[in-house]
Amino acid sequence: MEPGIRVDPGCSKWDIRQKVWDYIENNNLADFPRPVHHRIPNFKESHQACQNIIDLEVFRRTWEVKVDPDKPLEGVRLAALQARKTLLVPTPRLRTGLFNKITPPPGANKEVLRICSTSQGVKDYSVPMGLDAKVQVDLVVVGSVAVSVQGWRIGKGEGFADMEYAMMVSMGAVTEHTVVVTVVHDCQVVDIPEELLEDHDLTVDFILTPTRIIKTDCKRAKPQGIIWSMITREMMGKIPILRNLQDRERRAGKDVSLKDGNASEQGSRQSPLCLPEKELGPCGSVLSEHKHLANAQLHTKLEACNLHDGATVYIGDIPSTTRVSELKSMLRERGAAPLRLTWQGAQHRAFLDYRDVAQAKQALSSLEGISINGISLLVELARTQRPKANGNQGFRNNKLRATNPSTVSQPHIPT
């Protein structure tokens, strides 16, 4: 068994994630894709851990298995296909539904089944299943960043596994008897304080490692369905299946009020002709409230920090409930902290200024796949336009154009 990772008192979920990711990378345990940070980490003995699934009675007796698409679960998907079980995988980002069913071609041999179990096979050999499909899943296999012997689980922070399970409850695909299994390296089994768990967090019944099968005997209740008071309008827009499930539960007389139920539905469709609301000044200084700087002056300040054209990264589709401090924390965790951050929360976007184009492109790579509360963020280089002879300047992006390029409003950011 791998030496344990120490979890300090008062640590957060993100602290635990970072410790696990760092440990796997620093101890040469990681396998492709790398780095493992901000992923369900793949590890070198993942297939050995996955083979333990065939020793579980629930695997032998079930015919429908739902397995997440994470790389370290590839061996479980292969085992399910080889056992001729119905293999369900989540629809990518839940954009078009909940499940895809893997359908190997007739007469598929072991090599073809192996391909079907990979991420490419999920794309090439799966068909979507509608909400009305009669599905009864007795076994759910999820990836984890960390898990405790008590069954407490921590994912990569996007909430998809929790959301998928809650959706399955709502559509009647799982019951209280459904067994949840996770596959991890031994080092990922850590002490997780129960106070970090929330009502929507999914727990596990079995932990499979390369050396052990751990039965958790977890008594904590699994999610009983979608907690609508935690769902935002942005999430409803990004995950269309939620609207269908909301309509179903509304007709059944359930309270389906959203977290931001009084918020305007036009938030994500607001005109792009808007000026910044909150902005950190060059080199991290805070600009005074409602102070207007001429663009030539702003250009001079940027030059003082040696910022260059093309060194600005645009982040869009930011949920309206996100605070600037949350975004800054995520940027630091991914090693993508900018010299200057322009926050436009009402328009669901932000601009990150880096010292040069190389740093901006490195930030793009670090921010790949970033999401908040299950909502994928749009991250791309912002197209910039330097001042011309008349001093006019503005940022150009497919979602931003300044209405009056002669001034930029830069309110103070509360600390």
Curated annotation (Swiss-Prot):
The family database entries (InterPro entries) matched by this protein are listed as: FTHF_cligase (IPR002698), FTHF_cligase-like_sf (IPR024185), MTHFSD_RRM (IPR034359), NagB/RpiA_transferase-like (IPR037171), Nucleotide-bd_a/b_plait_sf (IPR012677), RBD_domain_sf (IPR035979), RRM_dom (IPR000504)
Q: Where is the RRM domain?
A: 311-384
Name the domain of life this protein comes from: Eukaryota
Provide the Gene Ontology terms for cellular component.
Answer: cytoplasm
The secretion signal range is none
Spell out the Pfam families in the cross-references. 5-FTHF_cyc-lig
- Name the residues that span the membrane: none
The answer to keyword RNA-binding applying to this record is yes
CDD domains per the record? RRM_MTHFSD (cd12270)
UniProt keyword Isomerase present: no
Q: Where does the record place the region Disordered?
A: 252-272, 388-415
Regions of biased composition (Polar residues) lie at 390-415
Q: Which UniProt keywords apply?
A: RNA-binding
Q: Which GO terms describe its molecular function?
A: RNA binding
Could you tell me which PANTHER family the record lists for this protein?
A: 5-FORMYLTETRAHYDROFOLATE CYCLO-LIGASE-RELATED, METHENYLTETRAHYDROFOLATE SYNTHASE DOMAIN-CONTAINING PROTEIN
* Name of protein: Methenyltetrahydrofolate synthase domain-containing protein
Q: Which gene is this protein's source?
A: mthfsd
